[in-house]
């Protein structure tokens, strides 16, 4: 019988009779009275002011405890083993705590209340699952305010599951950015700009703010309580900009130009059944965890003839024949375009392919099989998310609404005037017609939005005047348009004049969710099973290699189940068998596996954490 089970049997026979031990050692904080320091902090000795060692009478059952005769002999024999275990869990008086080598180690030793002289255990001594801990103790506060996971977080096996496990319980300490990471980010931005050139609205924003502040009658034009509607740029506005750019604009580009980069995707992973939610009624289930990701590159093409462009000829022909232009740019009416585009796509055997781009600082691809497998499954996640979001526009609409609301956003809050004008400038070719509808209080043709959109006055006229011609009674915008045109040459009078009024329906996150969900729905019949991973040299963007895969749902579901069990605490982390990887790990100096310990030694060192876990369960049971 192992030492742990000796302890467990002994503990049950005494703890639940008088519960003397539970009053003293049931609390984790009494087991190890210390705070561990990193190398950046001062060493702190344990003094006599700390809680007493548990090696006195507190660790023994009361002498008046009556136990069954058959247990007395075994209790006596095992008591010394138990005392030794407890003694190993508590620092002696006057002990000096050593410094740990990095913040990640400091974090996990403090959160787990470990003796810094000991190695890290392989067993979670807390009552929190990895996801629960990740959502409560995280250096990135956004994960606490909005509990969620990313696709890359699900790929815990990529390097070493034990490292991923320790990273979670260290408080998800952010590792410093390396030069290779910085170069990789620059390459991603470069590739993105090649397809989606950035439109910088900084000068326009500065002009609008300066002009508004110079209006002598600003407070009459915009009451004080509405100032935030004009100028405020908060989290709602930032999400609106992201949805307009990385959903609506990117999906429209995919329809019109066959390719798009950096598209936002998400799904809801139900930990109970270990699969992604497919029914809108399950989205709000507490066990459904938001999982987000960004797919690097999506292409719509004829797989048997990649040079075939007839589909896009038809779509461009429809746009040119049916919509007016401003500055040689068609003003697309999405209410007419979306159903027609979907019908055109259904007549062609074009399929979507999904690619993730990995940057390399050296001209070679990874040699580790687990790293290559993780990259493959990353593309599988993106492909699966796209399927979930394109199969039913209503589901996608409510999925996006839930996404925003989980982040604490009011989806019916009007966007600021400044945000609206910037969205119009960047995306007037697809938003202008919709904005006219909103201004007039007309439906956009998508029932879930039209049935729930809230009508309210939205003043989109007062601040669009120059101070030298300002008038509340008879607004004059001539000079204002001239000043705007000097900034970037756009024909603002054509795209602004019809909107300069008090709108009946304001632009909101709800509106953007509606159009994004419809754009996803255009691709319902054109989803493909080909995914790939590109490896590029980050300094030159040279393509080093491309690994192509065939999406396999059964294989993907096995990975989803494994990730779910890890994050829900249903299985233990599996350490890497390749110890050469340990030299890159921040936990190496305290990891049993990296130290090459035998199985017997590892098992022995997990006794303490198992006891902590057991005591937590005892505490929960006694409270219940």
Swiss-Prot record:
GO terms for molecular function: 4 iron, 4 sulfur cluster binding; DNA binding; metal ion binding; single-stranded DNA 5'-3' DNA exonuclease activity. Binds 1 [4Fe-4S] cluster. [4Fe-4S] cluster binds at residues 160, 582, 585, 591. Residues 37-80 are annotated as: Disordered. One of its GO terms (biological process) is interstrand cross-link repair. It comes from the Eukaryota. It comes from Candida dubliniensis (strain CD36 / ATCC MYA-646 / CBS 7987 / NCPF 3949 / NRRL Y-17841) (Yeast). This is Exonuclease V, mitochondrial. Single strand DNA specific 5'exonuclease involved in mitochondrial DNA replication and recombination. Releases dinucleotides as main products of catalysis. Has the capacity to slide across 5'double-stranded DNA or 5'RNA sequences and resumes cutting two nucleotides downstream of the double-stranded-to-single-stranded junction or RNA-to-DNA junction, respectively. The gene is EXO5. Keywords: 4Fe-4S, DNA-binding, Exonuclease, Hydrolase, Iron, Iron-sulfur, Magnesium, Metal-binding, Mitochondrion, Nuclease, Transit peptide.
């Amino acid at each position: 019988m192992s030492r742990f089970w000796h302890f467990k049997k002994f503990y049950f026979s005494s703890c639940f009779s008088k519960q003397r031990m539970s009053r003293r050692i049931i609390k984790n904080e009494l087991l190890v009275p210390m705070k561990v320091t990193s190398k950046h902090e001062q060493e702190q000795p344990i003094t006599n002011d700390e809680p007493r060692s548990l090696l006195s009478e507190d660790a023994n059952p009361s002498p008046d405890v009556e136990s069954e005769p058959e247990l007395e002999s075994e209790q006596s024999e095992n008591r010394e083993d138990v005392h030794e275990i407890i003694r190993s869990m508590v620092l002696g008086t006057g002990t000096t705590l050593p410094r740990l080598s990095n913040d990640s180690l400091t974090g996990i030793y403090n959160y787990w209340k470990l003796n810094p002289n000991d190695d890290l255990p392989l067993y979670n001594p807390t009552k929190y699952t990895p996801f629960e801990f990740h959502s409560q103790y995280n250096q990135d506060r956004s994960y606490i305010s909005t509990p969620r996971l990313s696709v890359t977080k699900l790929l815990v096996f990529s390097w070493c599951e034990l490292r991923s496990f320790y990273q979670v319980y260290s408080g998800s300490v952010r590792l410093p950015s390396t030069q290779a990471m910085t170069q990789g980010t620059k390459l991603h931005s470069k590739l993105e700009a090649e397809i989606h050139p950035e439109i910088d609205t900084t000068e326009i924003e500065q002009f609008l703010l300066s002009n508004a502040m110079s209006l002598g009658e600003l407070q009459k034009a915009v009451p004080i309580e509405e100032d935030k509607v004009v100028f405020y740029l908060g989290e709602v506005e930032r999400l609106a900009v992201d949805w307009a750019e990385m959903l609506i604009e990117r999906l429209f580009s995919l329809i019109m130009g066959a390719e798009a980069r950096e598209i936002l995707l998400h799904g809801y992973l139900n930990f109970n059944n270990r699969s992604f939610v497919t029914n809108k009624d399950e989205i709000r289930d507490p066990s459904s965890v938001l999982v987000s990701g960004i797919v690097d590159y999506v292409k719509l093409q004829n797989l048997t003839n990649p040079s075939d462009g007839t589909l896009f000829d038809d779509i461009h022909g429809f746009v040119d024949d049916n919509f007016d232009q401003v500055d040689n740019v068609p003003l697309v009416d999405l209410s007419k375009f979306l159903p027609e585009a979907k019908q055109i796509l259904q007549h062609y055997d074009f399929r979507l392919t999904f690619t993730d781009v990995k940057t390399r600082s050296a001209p070679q691809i990874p040699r580790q099989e687990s790293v290559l497998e993780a990259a493959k499954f990353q593309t599988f996640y993106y492909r699966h998310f796209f399927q979930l979001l394109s199969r039913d526009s209503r589901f996608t609409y409510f999925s996006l609404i839930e996404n925003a609301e989980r982040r604490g956003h009011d989806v019916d809050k009007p966007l600021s005037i400044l945000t609206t004008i910037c969205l119009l400038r960047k995306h007037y070719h697809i938003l202008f017609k919709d904005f006219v509808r909103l201004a007039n209080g007309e439906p956009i043709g998508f029932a879930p939005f039209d049935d729930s959109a809230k009508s309210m006055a939205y003043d989109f006229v007062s601040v669009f005047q120059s101070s030298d011609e300002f008038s509340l009674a008879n607004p004059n915008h001539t000079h204002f348009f001239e000043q705007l045109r000097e900034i970037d040459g756009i024909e603002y009078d054509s795209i602004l004049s019809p909107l300069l009024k008090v709108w009946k329906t304001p632009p909101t996150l709800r509106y953007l969710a509606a159009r994004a969900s419809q754009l996803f729905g255009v691709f319902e019949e054109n989803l493909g099973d080909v995914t790939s991973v590109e490896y590029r040299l980050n300094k030159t963007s040279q393509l080093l290699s491309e690994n192509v895969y065939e999406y396999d749902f059964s294989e993907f579901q096995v990975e989803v189940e494994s990730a779910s069990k890890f994050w829900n605490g249903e299985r233990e982390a599996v350490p890497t068998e390749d110890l050469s990887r340990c030299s890159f790990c921040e936990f190496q100096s305290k990891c049993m596996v990296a130290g090459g310990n035998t199985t017997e030694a590892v098992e022995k060192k997990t006794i303490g954490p198992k006891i902590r876990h057991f005591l937590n369960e005892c505490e929960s049971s006694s409270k219940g």
